[in-house]
């Protein structure tokens, strides 16, 4: 899996059992639950490759997401992954620390 060059984050890794650096995979996960949709940006522990999903949208109606952006999520658009991966407000909302 190719990793994207964005802000590294620090989070407790469930595989390593301690705080580790995580990197952006450039992949999104989209999950439909009835009439609602969840979208996550997937990060990965640099050491053990455990994944961490950062919430982009949670339990929203698909009509609240622009058709173009929704299509880009489904296509794992690298440019969109970089945009979210460098958005400090997005990262803060997901309660992660910024890496060095």
Q: What residue spans do the PLM features occupy?
A:
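Short beta-strand micro-motifs in enzyme catalytic cores
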Residues: 37-41
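Cys/His-rich microdomains that often coordinate metals
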Residues: 20, 52
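Short, flexible domain-boundary/linker segments around small modular repeats
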Residues: 22-24
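Short cysteine-rich clusters marking metal-coordination/redox-active sites
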Residues: 11-16, 45-48
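Short, intrinsically disordered terminal segments enriched in charged and Pro/Gly residues
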Residues: 1-10, 26-30, 34, 54-100
């Amino acid at each position: 899996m190719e990793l994207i060059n964005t802000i590294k984050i620090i989070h407790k890794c469930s595989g390593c059992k301690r705080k580790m650096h995580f990197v952006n995979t450039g992949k999104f996960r989209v999950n439909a639950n009835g009439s609602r949709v969840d979208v996550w940006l997937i990060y990965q522990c640099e050491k053990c490759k455990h994944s961490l999903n950062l919430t982009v949208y949670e339990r929203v109606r698909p009509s609240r997401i622009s058709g173009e952006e929704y299509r880009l999520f489904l296509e794992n658009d690298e440019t969109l992954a970089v945009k979210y991966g460098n958005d400090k407000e997005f990262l803060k909302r997901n309660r992660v620390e910024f890496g060095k």
